[in-house]
């Protein structure tokens, strides 16, 4: 267990937390959420002792061990992969080092023998004999092949280093586990493995993540950082979001009898619980949900941008025909004879292990890049809005304020008040609209690019990782806006829930062909024939 008592912290004149009092108990996984900049990562550093609060303290039960997912990917460059994982249990690694140093001595004294015996006893108590096999199991689960286990960290790629550091945090069954964005840079298989690991983990987990599917899968509770306080709610992220919306609705219907409000809450909980999986964690979470009262749900103060793409005209039957597109970049063939026909109601999610392949395809069909061979043709009734993964060219060197920046992309001569109102709905309020475009944060740039796409009135959206840099509120708003979109879409995203709730067709691009299926993302992942075909294509 980890208890937070009267913790307050401020940086300069900015207050992050004030008199926070909460407990995180064993057997539960807490999703720590809050707007960008609210202080989620800072709070994890307070819990780990890396940052000292101005008032209050953090208390752990005596003898308990805390593990943290390290963020510095270059910290262990000269160490072997397997050893880096075992370093996750600091005391065990110290014992191993001291023990090995004694046995390496050429003149082994009686004192050395006594000390070695003490260390051997402690080594056995700490499950030292299983350390290497446990580390290897964690690495294998995350997709690090055995031939890399004895390599130095410096020899690994960026995403491989992330996996090793994650294995380090998970190693040795820590009593409290702190994970800051653990799914970043992980492939789908590694995320699924991590989900199962955390679902079966018996101690305390506190996780920060922008991945709603992940939060829904692993969390028993949500810790909401808002107004410098942290409030803990039972349930996963979707339950927190839906219940906060219900609480807002009930607060606006204050004249309704309490009995009616209680009935609405009970119906909501029953409906939500009915969709839960049968896992041990989901079952225990369901029992907690059934005890919820009206006082346990509260409206959120979160602000959600207003995302609404309205096509100016309907699409005809001819949408897009792609035939034999091939492209080589820096000597590597990223697209090889890609062909497909897009229909008017398609919302196609593009997947694949090589992200550059999807980005290249989107650039070609948007007219930003030439193919080496092959053709594509848009239907005469179509108009496209392209959202690139790298948007830097739209902002770098721009001295325009946000109103003038947006005006240059407006197809109609819109008034200042219209553009200010539009930006306001995307959470740029008051004086923020006078910000220079070249000083925006990553999330602000994405909201500007989405505003540009909405103003276009396009009936085809081409979106390359539109959820990057967005907070959970903006991702949720964009997700809902695209579900309602009446046009057609080609898009890619690492956000599982985003893809699952929007796409009705999946195209995976492999080096040896595509797999194109009219089905949802989860069906695509669970379809044995599809997965067999993909395995064959990647193996060729």
Curated annotation (Swiss-Prot):
GO MF annotations, alphabetized: ATP binding; ATP hydrolysis activity
SUPFAM superfamilies: P-loop containing nucleoside triphosphate hydrolases
Keyword Zinc among UniProt keywords: no
Source organism of this protein record: Bacillus subtilis (strain 168)
A Pfam family assignment: ABC_tran_Xtn
Binding of ATP, residues: 34-41
Sequence similarity: Belongs to the ABC transporter superfamily.
Name used for this protein in its record: Uncharacterized ABC transporter ATP-binding protein YkpA
Record-linked InterPro entries: AAA+_ATPase, ABC_tran_Xtn, ABC_transporter-like_ATP-bd, ABCF_ATPase, P-loop_NTPase
Keywords: ATP-binding, Nucleotide-binding, Repeat, Transport
Start and end residues of each ABC transporter domain: 2-252, 320-537
């Amino acid at each position: 267990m980890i208890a937070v008592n009267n913790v307050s912290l401020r940086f300069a004149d900015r207050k992050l937390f004030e008199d926070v009092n909460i407990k995180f108990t064993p057997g539960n996984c807490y999703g720590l959420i809050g707007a960008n900049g609210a202080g989620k990562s800072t709070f994890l550093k307070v819990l780990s002792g890396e940052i000292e609060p101005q008032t209050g303290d953090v208390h752990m039960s005596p003898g308990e061990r805390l593990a943290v997912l390290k963020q510095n990917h270059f910290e262990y460059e000269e160490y072997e992969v397997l050893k880096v994982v075992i370093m996750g249990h600091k005391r065990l690694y110290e014992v191993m080092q001291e023990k090995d140093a004694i046995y390496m001595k050429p003149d082994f004294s009686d004192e050395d023998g006594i000390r070695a015996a003490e260390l051997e006893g402690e080594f056995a108590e700490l499950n030292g004999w299983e350390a290497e096999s446990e580390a290897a199991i964690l690495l294998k689960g995350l997709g690090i092949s055995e031939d890399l286990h004895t390599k130095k960290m410096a020899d690994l790629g960026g995403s491989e280093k992330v996996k090793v550091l994650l294995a380090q945090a998970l190693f040795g069954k820590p009593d409290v586990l702190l994970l800051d964005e653990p799914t970043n840079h992980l492939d789908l298989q590694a995320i699924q493995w991590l989900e199962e690991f955390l679902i079966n983990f018996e101690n305390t987990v506190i996780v920060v993540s922008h991945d709603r599917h992940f939060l829904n899968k692993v969390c028993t509770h949500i810790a909401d950082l808002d107004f410098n306080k942290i409030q803990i709610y039972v349930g996963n992220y979707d339950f927190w979001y839906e219940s906060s919306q219900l609480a807002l609705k009930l607060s606006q219907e204050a004249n309704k009898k309490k009995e009616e409000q209680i009935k609405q809450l009970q119906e909501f909980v029953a409906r939500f619980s009915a969709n839960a999986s049968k896992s041990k964690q989901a079952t225990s979470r369901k029992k907690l949900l059934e005890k919820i009262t009206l006082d346990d749900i509260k409206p959120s103060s979160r602000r959600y941008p207003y995302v609404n793409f309205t096509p100016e005209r309907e699409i005809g039957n001819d949408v897009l025909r792609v035939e034999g597109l091939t492209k080589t970049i820096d000597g590597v063939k990223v697209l090889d004879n890609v062909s497909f026909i897009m229909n008017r109601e398609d919302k196609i999610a593009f997947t694949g292990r090589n992200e550059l392949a999807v980005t290249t395809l989107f650039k070609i069909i948007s007219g930003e890049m030439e193919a080496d061979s092959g053709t594509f043709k848009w239907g005469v009734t179509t108009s496209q809005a392209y959202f690139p993964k790298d948007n830097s060219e739209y902002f770098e060197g721009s001295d325009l304020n946000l109103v003038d920046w947006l005006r240059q992309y407006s197809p109609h001569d819109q008034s200042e008040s219209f553009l200010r109102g539009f930006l306001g709905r995307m959470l740029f309020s008051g004086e923020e609209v006078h910000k220079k475009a070249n000083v925006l944060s990553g999330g602000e740039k994405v909201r500007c690019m989405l505003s540009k796409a909405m103003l276009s009135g396009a009936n085809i959206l081409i979106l390359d990782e539109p959820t990057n840099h967005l907070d959970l509120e903006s991702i949720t708003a964009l997700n809902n806006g695209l579900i309602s979109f009446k046009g057609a879409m080609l898009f890619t995203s690492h956000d599982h829930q985003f893809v699952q709730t929007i796409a009705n067709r999946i195209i995976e691009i492999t080096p040896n062909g595509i797999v194109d299926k009219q089905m949802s993302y989860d069906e695509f992942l669970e379809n044995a024939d599809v997965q067999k075909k993909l395995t064959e294509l990647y193996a060729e």
